[in-house]
Protein backbone atom coordinates (compact mmCIF):
# COMPACT_ATOMS: atom_id res chain seq x y z
CA UNK A 1 0.00 0.00 0.00
CA UNK A 2 1.26 3.47 -0.81
CA UNK A 3 1.07 4.74 2.77
CA UNK A 4 3.30 1.93 4.03
CA UNK A 5 0.49 0.28 5.98
CA UNK A 6 -0.06 -3.45 5.70
CA UNK A 7 -3.18 -4.47 3.81
CA UNK A 8 -4.01 -6.92 6.60
CA UNK A 9 -2.11 -6.04 9.80
CA UNK A 10 -3.78 -8.92 11.70
CA UNK A 11 -2.80 -11.65 9.22
CA UNK A 12 -0.36 -13.47 11.53
CA UNK A 13 -2.89 -13.39 14.36
CA UNK A 14 -5.60 -14.93 12.17
CA UNK A 15 -3.66 -18.22 12.15
CA UNK A 16 -4.68 -18.66 15.80
CA UNK A 17 -8.36 -17.82 15.30
CA UNK A 18 -11.17 -20.38 15.47
CA UNK A 19 -11.87 -22.10 12.14
CA UNK A 20 -14.78 -20.49 10.32
CA UNK A 21 -14.24 -17.06 11.84
CA UNK A 22 -15.87 -14.30 9.81
CA UNK A 23 -15.58 -11.33 12.16
CA UNK A 24 -13.49 -10.15 15.09
CA UNK A 25 -15.06 -8.78 18.28
CA UNK A 26 -12.98 -7.45 21.16
CA UNK A 27 -14.85 -7.18 24.45
CA UNK A 28 -14.22 -6.06 28.01
CA UNK A 29 -16.23 -6.27 31.22
CA UNK A 30 -16.45 -4.26 34.39
CA UNK A 31 -17.81 -6.00 37.47
CA UNK A 32 -18.73 -5.29 41.05
CA UNK A 33 -18.33 -7.41 44.19
CA UNK A 34 -18.86 -7.59 47.92
CA UNK A 35 -15.69 -8.79 49.58
CA UNK A 36 -17.37 -9.20 52.96
CA UNK A 37 -20.49 -11.15 51.97
CA UNK A 38 -20.12 -12.51 48.43
CA UNK A 39 -22.73 -14.71 46.81
CA UNK A 40 -20.64 -17.77 45.91
CA UNK A 41 -22.80 -18.53 42.88
CA UNK A 42 -21.82 -15.13 41.42
CA UNK A 43 -18.98 -13.53 43.40
CA UNK A 44 -18.41 -10.95 40.65
CA UNK A 45 -21.46 -9.26 39.13
CA UNK A 46 -21.04 -7.67 35.70
CA UNK A 47 -22.08 -4.02 35.64
CA UNK A 48 -20.83 -3.02 32.17
CA UNK A 49 -20.19 -4.72 28.83
CA UNK A 50 -18.17 -2.96 26.15
CA UNK A 51 -17.08 -4.28 22.77
CA UNK A 52 -15.95 -3.25 19.31
CA UNK A 53 -16.19 -5.04 15.98
CA UNK A 54 -13.18 -5.00 13.64
CA UNK A 55 -12.80 -5.38 9.90
CA UNK A 56 -10.00 -7.36 8.23
CA UNK A 57 -7.63 -4.40 8.56
CA UNK A 58 -8.19 -4.25 12.31
CA UNK A 59 -10.23 -1.05 12.10
CA UNK A 60 -13.15 -0.50 14.48
CA UNK A 61 -16.40 -0.57 12.52
CA UNK A 62 -18.97 -0.75 15.33
CA UNK A 63 -19.19 -0.45 19.12
CA UNK A 64 -21.32 -1.87 21.92
CA UNK A 65 -21.51 -0.25 25.35
CA UNK A 66 -24.09 -0.61 28.09
CA UNK A 67 -24.33 -0.42 31.86
CA UNK A 68 -26.21 -3.14 33.75
CA UNK A 69 -28.55 -2.73 36.69
CA UNK A 70 -27.20 -5.05 39.42
CA UNK A 71 -29.29 -7.71 41.10
CA UNK A 72 -26.98 -8.73 43.97
CA UNK A 73 -24.52 -5.95 44.77
CA UNK A 74 -26.40 -2.65 44.64
CA UNK A 75 -23.61 -0.66 46.30
CA UNK A 76 -20.58 -0.13 44.07
CA UNK A 77 -17.37 -1.21 45.77
CA UNK A 78 -15.25 1.83 46.71
CA UNK A 79 -12.22 0.72 44.69
CA UNK A 80 -14.32 -0.09 41.63
CA UNK A 81 -16.06 3.28 41.84
CA UNK A 82 -12.68 5.05 42.04
CA UNK A 83 -11.23 3.13 39.09
CA UNK A 84 -14.23 3.20 36.73
CA UNK A 85 -16.17 6.24 37.90
CA UNK A 86 -19.38 4.18 37.71
CA UNK A 87 -21.98 5.21 40.30
CA UNK A 88 -25.03 3.52 41.84
CA UNK A 89 -27.24 6.16 40.26
CA UNK A 90 -25.98 5.33 36.76
CA UNK A 91 -26.48 1.61 37.32
CA UNK A 92 -30.00 2.03 38.69
CA UNK A 93 -31.18 3.27 35.29
CA UNK A 94 -29.56 0.39 33.40
CA UNK A 95 -31.24 -2.72 32.02
CA UNK A 96 -30.91 -6.19 33.53
CA UNK A 97 -28.07 -8.55 32.68
CA UNK A 98 -30.22 -10.97 30.61
CA UNK A 99 -31.54 -8.07 28.52
CA UNK A 100 -28.12 -6.53 27.90
CA UNK A 101 -26.43 -9.87 27.25
CA UNK A 102 -29.03 -10.81 24.64
CA UNK A 103 -28.18 -7.64 22.70
CA UNK A 104 -24.45 -8.25 23.18
CA UNK A 105 -24.79 -11.79 21.79
CA UNK A 106 -26.61 -10.41 18.74
CA UNK A 107 -23.86 -7.81 18.31
CA UNK A 108 -21.23 -10.58 18.30
CA UNK A 109 -23.11 -12.86 15.90
CA UNK A 110 -22.57 -16.57 15.35
CA UNK A 111 -19.12 -16.67 13.74
CA UNK A 112 -17.03 -13.99 15.43
CA UNK A 113 -13.63 -14.59 16.99
CA UNK A 114 -13.85 -13.08 20.46
CA UNK A 115 -10.76 -11.45 21.96
CA UNK A 116 -10.05 -10.18 25.46
CA UNK A 117 -7.04 -8.76 27.28
CA UNK A 118 -6.42 -11.31 30.03
CA UNK A 119 -8.10 -14.52 31.12
CA UNK A 120 -10.51 -13.14 33.76
CA UNK A 121 -13.43 -11.82 31.68
CA UNK A 122 -14.71 -15.09 30.23
CA UNK A 123 -14.96 -17.03 33.55
CA UNK A 124 -16.79 -14.05 35.09
CA UNK A 125 -19.14 -13.96 32.10
CA UNK A 126 -19.82 -17.70 32.40
CA UNK A 127 -20.62 -17.48 36.12
CA UNK A 128 -23.00 -14.59 35.49
CA UNK A 129 -24.72 -16.64 32.79
CA UNK A 130 -24.89 -19.69 35.07
CA UNK A 131 -26.45 -17.56 37.81
CA UNK A 132 -29.25 -16.67 35.39
CA UNK A 133 -29.33 -20.30 34.17
CA UNK A 134 -28.26 -19.38 30.65
CA UNK A 135 -25.70 -21.35 28.59
CA UNK A 136 -22.79 -19.50 27.04
CA UNK A 137 -23.23 -19.16 23.26
CA UNK A 138 -19.52 -18.43 22.84
CA UNK A 139 -16.33 -20.43 22.64
CA UNK A 140 -13.57 -19.18 24.95
CA UNK A 141 -12.01 -15.97 23.60
CA UNK A 142 -8.44 -15.53 22.47
CA UNK A 143 -6.35 -13.97 25.24
CA UNK A 144 -4.43 -11.15 23.53
CA UNK A 145 -2.44 -10.47 26.71
CA UNK A 146 -1.06 -14.01 26.67
CA UNK A 147 -0.22 -13.87 22.96
CA UNK A 148 1.43 -10.47 23.41
CA UNK A 149 3.64 -11.77 26.22
CA UNK A 150 4.66 -14.83 24.21
CA UNK A 151 5.30 -12.96 20.96
CA UNK A 152 7.20 -10.01 22.44
CA UNK A 153 8.94 -11.49 25.48
CA UNK A 154 8.94 -15.24 24.81
CA UNK A 155 6.85 -15.81 27.94
CA UNK A 156 3.09 -16.41 27.78
CA UNK A 157 2.85 -15.84 31.52
CA UNK A 158 4.46 -12.40 31.47
CA UNK A 159 1.34 -10.35 32.05
CA UNK A 160 1.61 -6.72 31.05
CA UNK A 161 -1.43 -4.60 31.80
CA UNK A 162 -3.26 -3.00 28.93
CA UNK A 163 -1.97 0.53 29.29
CA UNK A 164 1.61 -0.58 29.93
CA UNK A 165 1.41 -2.56 26.68
CA UNK A 166 0.18 0.54 24.84
CA UNK A 167 3.19 2.42 26.17
CA UNK A 168 5.57 -0.46 25.40
CA UNK A 169 4.49 -0.55 21.76
CA UNK A 170 4.16 3.21 21.33
CA UNK A 171 0.47 2.83 20.47
CA UNK A 172 -1.31 6.17 20.77
CA UNK A 173 -4.99 6.18 21.71
CA UNK A 174 -6.72 9.00 23.54
CA UNK A 175 -9.58 7.37 25.43
CA UNK A 176 -10.55 7.29 29.13
CA UNK A 177 -9.20 4.30 31.04
CA UNK A 178 -11.10 1.55 32.83
CA UNK A 179 -14.44 1.74 31.08
CA UNK A 180 -15.36 -1.39 29.20
CA UNK A 181 -15.77 -0.09 25.65
CA UNK A 182 -12.62 2.05 25.89
CA UNK A 183 -10.55 -0.85 27.20
CA UNK A 184 -11.90 -2.94 24.32
CA UNK A 185 -10.75 -0.23 21.90
CA UNK A 186 -7.31 -0.18 23.53
CA UNK A 187 -7.04 -3.95 23.09
CA UNK A 188 -8.10 -3.61 19.46
CA UNK A 189 -5.46 -0.92 18.92
CA UNK A 190 -2.80 -3.34 20.21
CA UNK A 191 -3.72 -6.24 17.93
CA UNK A 192 -1.53 -5.12 14.99
CA UNK A 193 1.47 -5.05 17.36
CA UNK A 194 0.48 -8.48 18.71
CA UNK A 195 0.26 -9.81 15.16
CA UNK A 196 3.60 -8.26 14.16
CA UNK A 197 5.25 -10.00 17.10
CA UNK A 198 3.96 -13.34 15.81
CA UNK A 199 5.49 -12.87 12.36
CA UNK A 200 8.99 -13.61 13.63
CA UNK A 201 8.08 -16.90 15.30
CA UNK A 202 9.37 -20.12 13.79
CA UNK A 203 7.29 -23.27 13.42
CA UNK A 204 8.40 -24.71 16.76
CA UNK A 205 7.41 -21.56 18.65
CA UNK A 206 4.08 -21.35 16.80
CA UNK A 207 3.31 -24.93 17.78
CA UNK A 208 4.25 -24.14 21.37
CA UNK A 209 1.90 -21.15 21.40
CA UNK A 210 -0.89 -23.22 19.84
CA UNK A 211 -0.52 -25.80 22.62
CA UNK A 212 -0.63 -23.06 25.28
CA UNK A 213 -3.76 -21.53 23.75
CA UNK A 214 -5.41 -24.95 23.52
CA UNK A 215 -4.81 -25.50 27.24
CA UNK A 216 -6.12 -22.01 28.04
CA UNK A 217 -9.35 -22.83 26.22
CA UNK A 218 -9.78 -25.98 28.31
CA UNK A 219 -9.16 -23.97 31.48
CA UNK A 220 -11.65 -21.32 30.34
CA UNK A 221 -14.29 -24.07 30.00
CA UNK A 222 -13.66 -25.27 33.55
CA UNK A 223 -16.34 -26.27 35.99
CA UNK A 224 -16.08 -23.64 38.74
CA UNK A 225 -17.44 -24.39 42.21
CA UNK A 226 -17.32 -22.46 45.47
CA UNK A 227 -18.69 -23.83 48.71
CA UNK A 228 -18.65 -22.43 52.25
CA UNK A 229 -17.74 -24.87 55.01
CA UNK A 230 -17.93 -24.98 58.79
CA UNK A 231 -14.36 -26.22 58.98
CA UNK A 232 -11.48 -24.20 60.35
CA UNK A 233 -8.73 -26.73 59.50
CA UNK A 234 -7.83 -28.44 56.24
CA UNK A 235 -7.89 -31.97 57.67
CA UNK A 236 -11.61 -31.66 58.44
CA UNK A 237 -12.38 -30.25 54.99
CA UNK A 238 -10.45 -33.04 53.23
CA UNK A 239 -12.61 -35.65 54.97
CA UNK A 240 -15.82 -34.24 53.47
CA UNK A 241 -16.89 -35.52 50.03
CA UNK A 242 -19.04 -32.42 49.53
CA UNK A 243 -15.79 -30.43 49.52
CA UNK A 244 -13.53 -32.84 47.65
CA UNK A 245 -15.83 -34.34 44.99
CA UNK A 246 -14.65 -33.81 41.41
CA UNK A 247 -17.34 -33.21 38.76
CA UNK A 248 -16.73 -33.88 35.08
CA UNK A 249 -16.54 -30.55 33.20
CA UNK A 250 -18.60 -32.00 30.33
CA UNK A 251 -21.35 -34.13 31.89
CA UNK A 252 -21.26 -32.94 35.51
CA UNK A 253 -21.09 -36.47 36.92
CA UNK A 254 -18.96 -37.32 39.94
CA UNK A 255 -15.56 -38.66 38.87
CA UNK A 256 -13.31 -41.24 40.48
CA UNK A 257 -9.82 -40.19 41.55
CA UNK A 258 -6.79 -41.16 39.49
CA UNK A 259 -4.72 -38.86 41.72
CA UNK A 260 -6.31 -37.77 45.00
CA UNK A 261 -6.13 -34.19 46.24
CA UNK A 262 -2.69 -33.17 47.51
CA UNK A 263 -1.22 -29.81 48.50
CA UNK A 264 1.09 -28.81 45.65
CA UNK A 265 2.22 -25.74 47.62
CA UNK A 266 0.76 -22.66 49.29
CA UNK A 267 -2.48 -24.46 50.17
CA UNK A 268 -3.21 -25.04 46.48
CA UNK A 269 -4.46 -28.58 45.97
CA UNK A 270 -4.32 -30.59 42.75
CA UNK A 271 -5.98 -33.83 41.67
CA UNK A 272 -6.74 -35.91 38.58
CA UNK A 273 -10.26 -37.27 38.14
CA UNK A 274 -11.51 -39.90 35.72
CA UNK A 275 -14.88 -39.83 33.96
CA UNK A 276 -15.94 -43.11 32.31
CA UNK A 277 -17.38 -41.19 29.35
CA UNK A 278 -15.07 -38.19 28.90
CA UNK A 279 -11.67 -39.26 30.20
CA UNK A 280 -9.40 -37.49 32.65
CA UNK A 281 -9.70 -34.02 34.13
CA UNK A 282 -7.38 -31.79 36.13
CA UNK A 283 -8.71 -30.44 39.41
CA UNK A 284 -7.36 -27.40 41.24
CA UNK A 285 -8.67 -26.40 44.67
CA UNK A 286 -8.00 -23.62 47.14
CA UNK A 287 -9.27 -23.64 50.72
CA UNK A 288 -9.48 -19.97 51.63
CA UNK A 289 -10.02 -18.77 55.18
CA UNK A 290 -12.69 -16.11 55.60
CA UNK A 291 -13.02 -13.35 58.16
CA UNK A 292 -15.20 -15.70 60.24
CA UNK A 293 -12.30 -18.16 60.54
CA UNK A 294 -13.96 -20.84 58.42
CA UNK A 295 -12.69 -22.23 55.12
CA UNK A 296 -14.37 -21.70 51.77
CA UNK A 297 -13.64 -24.16 48.99
CA UNK A 298 -12.92 -22.79 45.51
CA UNK A 299 -12.51 -25.45 42.84
CA UNK A 300 -11.70 -25.51 39.12
CA UNK A 301 -11.90 -28.68 36.98
CA UNK A 302 -10.98 -28.90 33.28
CA UNK A 303 -10.19 -31.64 30.77
CA UNK A 304 -6.57 -32.75 31.09
CA UNK A 305 -4.03 -33.58 28.40
CA UNK A 306 -1.80 -36.65 28.74
CA UNK A 307 1.15 -34.39 29.57
CA UNK A 308 -0.80 -32.70 32.38
CA UNK A 309 -1.83 -36.06 33.84
CA UNK A 310 1.80 -37.18 33.81
CA UNK A 311 2.99 -33.93 35.42
CA UNK A 312 0.42 -34.04 38.24
CA UNK A 313 1.03 -37.76 38.79
CA UNK A 314 4.77 -37.17 39.06
CA UNK A 315 4.26 -34.27 41.48
CA UNK A 316 2.09 -36.54 43.63
CA UNK A 317 4.69 -39.32 43.53
CA UNK A 318 7.37 -36.90 44.74
CA UNK A 319 4.99 -35.60 47.42
CA UNK A 320 4.52 -39.11 48.80
CA UNK A 321 8.28 -39.71 48.79
CA UNK A 322 8.82 -36.61 50.93
CA UNK A 323 8.86 -37.44 54.66
CA UNK A 324 5.88 -35.80 56.44
CA UNK A 325 8.26 -33.81 58.66
CA UNK A 326 9.69 -32.11 55.54
CA UNK A 327 6.40 -31.29 53.82
CA UNK A 328 5.91 -27.98 55.67
CA UNK A 329 2.40 -29.03 56.80
CA UNK A 330 1.27 -29.93 53.28
CA UNK A 331 -1.51 -32.54 53.26
CA UNK A 332 -3.05 -35.09 50.94
CA UNK A 333 -6.59 -36.42 51.06
CA UNK A 334 -5.74 -40.14 51.11
CA UNK A 335 -3.43 -39.85 54.12
CA UNK A 336 -5.89 -37.66 56.02
CA UNK A 337 -8.66 -40.21 55.47
CA UNK A 338 -6.48 -43.18 56.43
CA UNK A 339 -5.58 -41.49 59.71
CA UNK A 340 -9.27 -40.71 60.30
CA UNK A 341 -10.24 -44.34 59.74
CA UNK A 342 -7.59 -45.55 62.18
CA UNK A 343 -8.97 -43.10 64.73
CA UNK A 344 -12.51 -44.31 64.01
CA UNK A 345 -13.41 -40.87 62.61
CA UNK A 346 -15.22 -41.68 59.33
CA UNK A 347 -15.19 -39.46 56.28
CA UNK A 348 -18.35 -37.60 55.36
CA UNK A 349 -19.81 -39.07 52.19
CA UNK A 350 -21.48 -36.80 49.69
Where are the predicted features?
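Acidic two-metal-ion nuclease catalytic site recognized across multiple nuclease folds
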Residues: 2-16, 193-350
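Conserved non-catalytic scaffold segment of RNase H-like nuclease domains
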Residues: 2-123, 222-225, 283-330
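Metal-dependent phosphoesterase core characteristic of DEDDh/y 3'-5' exonuclease domains
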Residues: 4-7, 42-49, 53-84, 106-229, ...
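A general structural-boundary detector
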Residues: 38, 87, 91, 112, ...
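Short aromatic/hydrophobic-glycine micro-motifs
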Residues: 86, 134, 171, 253-255, ...
Amino acid sequence: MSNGMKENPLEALYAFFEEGTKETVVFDLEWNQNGYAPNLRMPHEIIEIGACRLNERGEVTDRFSELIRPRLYRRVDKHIRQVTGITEQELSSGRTFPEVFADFARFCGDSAQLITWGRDDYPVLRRNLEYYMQPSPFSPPLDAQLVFGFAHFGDAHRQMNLHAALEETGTQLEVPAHRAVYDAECTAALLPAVSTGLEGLGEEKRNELSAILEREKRIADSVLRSRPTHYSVHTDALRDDAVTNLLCPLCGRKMSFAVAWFDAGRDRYEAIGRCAQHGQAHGQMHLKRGTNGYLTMHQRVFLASDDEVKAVSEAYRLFLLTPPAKRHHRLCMEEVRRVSERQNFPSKKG
